[in-house]
Amino acid sequence: MLASLIGGIFGTKNERELKRMRKIVEQINALEPTISALSDADLSAKTPEFKQRYNNGESLDKLLPEAFAVCREAAKRVMGMRHYDVQLIGGITLHEGKIAEMRTGEGKTLMGTLACYLNALSGEGVHVITVNDYLAQRDAELNRPLFEFLGLSIGTIYSMQEPAEKAAAYLADITYGTNNEFGFDYLRDNMVFSLAEKKQRGLHYAIIDEVDSILIDEARTPLIISGQSEDSSHLYTAINTIPPKLRPQKEEKVADGGHFWIDEKQRSVEMTEIGYETVEQELIQMGLLAEGESLYSATNLNLVHHVSAAIRAHFLFQRDVHYIIHDGEVIIVDEHTGRTMPGRRWSEGLHQAVEAKEGLAIQPENQTLATTTFQNYFRLYKKLSGMTGTADTEAAEMKEIYGLDVVIIPTHRPMIRNDQNDLIYLNRNGKYNAIIQEIMNIRQQGVAPILIGTATIEASEILSSKLKQAGIHHEVLNAKQHEREADIIAQAGSPNAVTIATNMAGRGTDIILGGNWKAKLAKLENPTPEDEARLKAQWEQDHEDVLQAGGLHIIGSERHESRRIDNQLRGRAGRQGDPGVSRFYLSLEDDLMRIFAGDRVVAMMRAMGLKEDEAIEHKMVSRSIENAQRKVEARNFDIRKNLLKYDDVNNEQRKIIYSQRDEILAENTLQEYVEEMHREVMQAMIANFIPPESIHDQWDVEGLENALRIDLGIELPVQEWLEQDRRLDEEGLVERISDEVIARYRQRRAQMGDESAAMLERHFVLNSLDRHWKDHLAAMDYLRQGIHLRGYAQKNPEQEYKKEAFNLFVNMLGVIKTDVVTDLSRVHIPTPEELAEMEAQQQQQAEAMKLSFEHDDVDGLTGEVTASQEALNDSATEQQTFPVPESRNAPCPCGSGLKYKQCHGKI
């Protein structure tokens, strides 16, 4: 009440925005006579002039009136269409990074060309995002003549596109594509092994068509890239025969002919020299290793991992202690609680090794390698805007989540559609019969076309069956074949047309009263001018007949949970001032009525003693349904907002990893990185044997020497150093060992040569980063699955999630460093041929990725995780918890005085 009173005095925010924008429109219109007088060549030459002015420091806002006037004049000459003033307002809205709500049929596609043209002048690229490939291709081809006349390049991206073609499309001034493809390309770009393989050149400015569908309905849809599950079952089965031929060494330090020694504390195994030789011979006999080839050559490290997993499976993991067999599957037993953990799987190939040991079918892993949500992807753009026919009902969410204001653009002509009250029936059968009867009544009265919107395919089939029984010809759409869908929707305004469509089908294509004569002309082979004149004359007659019959009739077979979806269906009729009628038919059995409409409405209808074919029509009922829809919308918004808090944690970690990956790819040499890794790993390793601030009696020097020998392949006389220099403390020891290890690494590096060493370093760093990031994603999923239970312990699940996620992230960084240092220390110096083979393997690995597109349940905090879960036990060391700072250049919260990227955020 108060809000409407204030709005009446001062005007609403939307009215104030429109008033401001109309002044800019006046400036554009004032330029029209001058711009119209330009020749085609002079008009086209305006684009390089604008680009030069922009490069000289003039802002796009300053260029806007003249650029819009040029774009409008070019559209008039090339496309035969002139932008209305309301379309200019829409273009200003898009340029300012807002959402333009424009009614169906008001020309959103043409409106978008204004903001595209202006923002393309910066040279940073504009992305136009649509809901399907057909619309992307259609809009790109429709606008291509205009943009090419103005000297701008245009590209389209789609799935399974040739890499060179896709790269060229991204280099174009304006790039069209679907939300899925843009999102997948972002993920793929962060899995490449050289900067030259990247396709996207930055996320500068995006215009999202049907923005409500993408940013609200699909907000939590995860884009997932998963590794094609390589069928390694034969490898696990073959290597499973090796462990029974081996025996453990009883003591780590005493060579007694054993093939490996067991570290039960760390649940790891290390092979002895005899073990290496034995395993190599076995692998050669199996044909898995070439004669004379080393197990520790760079290209064979995967075999080392397989053998290690097989030995661990046989000697460290016992049936009915660490796992049980149930229905032919290995189920992990939690060692702390004794409970089984269905759905969880050990990582690093251990689970498959246990399956091979038990003679079970080896389950391939289709692991998530990269994932993001549309919510997080689109928030990466420097400037984001969108257009739709229905966004005002979700304006609060658009503002809070994405920082986007919604501006309602007035219609070019007044809206005269007749939106009638809902009719409510006792049951679905009564409702469907009433719909069929209404269709027959409309057909008897004239030639008005009818569009029936359904919420489900099942409802479409029921109505289609009843229409067939009544002998009424009709079309059915289910939003699967986009091109056919658009064609049928385009003709859905023809006289006597009856079309059944799911509520979302055919979005982006206008329903023209009388049908679309241009689409009919395009289907003819070699059409003549006579054909064109005939079809146009026929359309003019059909158009007039449909107008006289009251325009398009919309019949909704039920209400959706969201008012916005209902408004989309209604918005099919009444385009550009055309007449039209809309009405929803409901029943007490509809989900929304059954769950949300309230007992009062249901009780009232039952008390009236209505029969199946009788309906109630009252504003109170319609209001009650709208109130129910508002409650559902508010609940869904709260769920999305709450889940976004958790997603934001993952998103920050993703940005750090991807940024680090780009830095690695951009560096010519990683020597400085790798040497720093050596120092950090040495510090952590030494701390395991020489605890900080401990006395000499607590030092396990022998254990440290063995660890250096086994993990890094380096013999250091640590005990001798201590005996020679009694003043050598813990800090001095760390420095001396680090210097020795790095000196040895530099020696090996010199033997390889700078170029080969740089390639090997990049190979191991990227491989380790990608492998552990994949495992980290699974661990984060598992953490999230049960985090809500912390609420029962009077803890804040959100804070607990942030704390645990940070610990997991820091631990992952530590494991990556350890892996890189260990692999680089133990790998045999590769030949140029082996390096080339490694590079080829990397490329094969990149090409073996497959895409998987899934919907995530919005209530994902309590739902089961369908992906295989990775063990969280890989890094059990307690870590101090610090919050992740907003910027990687901010001081690290640990208090070290270093930047975060050089401290806890460093790889």
Swiss-Prot record:
List locations, semicolon-separated: Cell inner membrane; Cytoplasm
Cofactor remark from the record: May bind 1 zinc ion per subunit.
Q: Where along this sequence does the record place binding of Zn(2+)?
A: C892, C894, C903, H904
Q: List the EC numbers from the record.
A: 7.4.2.8
Instruction: Identify which cofactors the protein needs according to its UniProt entry.
Output: Zn(2+)
The molecular function GO annotations come to: ATP binding; metal ion binding; protein-exporting ATPase activity
Q: Which superkingdom, per the lineage? A: Bacteria
- Which PROSITE patterns does the entry link to? SECA, SECA_MOTOR_DEAD
An example Gene Ontology biological process = protein transport by the Sec complex
Gene Ontology CC entries for this record? cell envelope Sec protein transport complex; cytosol; plasma membrane
Catalytically driven reaction(s): ATP + H2O + cellular proteinSide 1 = ADP + phosphate + cellular proteinSide 2
Kindly give the Pfam families that the UniProt entry links to this protein.
P-loop_SecA, SEC-C, SecA_DEAD, SecA_PP_bind, SecA_SW
For this UniProt record, give its keywords in alphabetical order, as a comma-separated list.
Answer: ATP-binding, Cell inner membrane, Cell membrane, Cytoplasm, Membrane, Metal-binding, Nucleotide-binding, Protein transport, Translocase, Translocation, Transport, Zinc
* Topology with respect to the bilayer: Peripheral membrane protein
Binding locations of ATP: Q87, G105, E106, G107, K108, T109, D510
Oligomeric and partner information: Monomer and homodimer. Part of the essential Sec protein translocation apparatus which comprises SecA, SecYEG and auxiliary proteins SecDF-YajC and YidC.
The UniProt family comment states: Belongs to the SecA family.
State its role. Answer: Part of the Sec protein translocase complex. Interacts with the SecYEG preprotein conducting channel. Has a central role in coupling the hydrolysis of ATP to the transfer of proteins into and across the cell membrane, serving both as a receptor for the preprotein-SecB complex and as an ATP-driven molecular motor driving the stepwise translocation of polypeptide chains across the membrane.
- Under which name does UniProt file this protein? Protein translocase subunit SecA
* Lineage of producing organism: Bacteria, Pseudomonadati, Pseudomonadota, Gammaproteobacteria, Moraxellales
